[in-house]
């Protein structure tokens, strides 16, 4: 099928990761996946949540938000509603647990790294772009800790990236933009490590059910996209 932006069914949108985007953060990136743009920062704080007290371990957590005009129609800020909306809450928990999967919390020591993901322009795949960009910010924050002598070795034990796949007009597509996502019969987000292991699969039959064969095809498609994303992460992390 001819996609909205001219891509093939198996093609990612263009990916750009710009490191050190925010001056004061220990790690930061601007990630662009097509027209979706997210600023991801990693901030180190010498404290841990109460449930980690005396554990000898650190913590990695995340917050997610979207600028009011990141979308075609202005959205209210969560603060104006005096509560975090359910979608933002779900996404930030997803980001946090995805990153904790590849961090040795004992090596991190009793400190917290907070990941802030701020969507400045949304065109589908904001949660997957947030995870992919946050990984790079997290690595840079941990490198800062090593350089300062606050930890002896890198606590990051692997790589994590995420992408979306779906079925639109009966065809399996990689990396859905907003128009495709809003018209998908099946929508799926996939998070994997560089070892090929799954962290999370979120699959929903939005307008129809799907078969085991289709599930396998979507997972294979996601795997190919994540392989490309991990390559892009490594290229920016090791170019200097």
From Swiss-Prot:
Stretches that traverse the bilayer: none
Keyword terms of this UniProt record: Nucleotidyltransferase, RNA-binding, rRNA processing, Transferase, tRNA processing, tRNA-binding
Cross-referenced InterPro entries: ExoRNase_PH_dom1, ExoRNase_PH_dom2, ExoRNase_PH_dom2_sf, PNPase/RNase_PH_dom_sf, Ribosomal_Su5_D2-typ_SF, RNase_PH, RNase_PH_bac-type, RNase_PH_CS
Highest taxon of source: Bacteria
Pfam family, one: RNase_PH
Single GO molecular function: tRNA binding
GO BP field: rRNA catabolic process; rRNA processing; tRNA processing
Disulfide bridge partners, by residue number: none
Catalysed transformations (reactions): tRNA(n+1) + phosphate = tRNA(n) + a ribonucleoside 5'-diphosphate
Amino acids binding phosphate: 87, 125-127
EC number: 2.7.7.56
Protein family according to the UniProt entry: Belongs to the RNase PH family.
Subunit organization: Homohexameric ring arranged as a trimer of dimers.
Role noted for this protein: Phosphorolytic 3'-5' exoribonuclease that plays an important role in tRNA 3'-end maturation. Removes nucleotide residues following the 3'-CCA terminus of tRNAs; can also add nucleotides to the ends of RNA molecules by using nucleoside diphosphates as substrates, but this may not be physiologically important. Probably plays a role in initiation of 16S rRNA degradation (leading to ribosome degradation) during starvation.
Protein name: Ribonuclease PH
Organism annotation: Ruminiclostridium cellulolyticum (strain ATCC 35319 / DSM 5812 / JCM 6584 / H10) (Clostridium cellulolyticum)
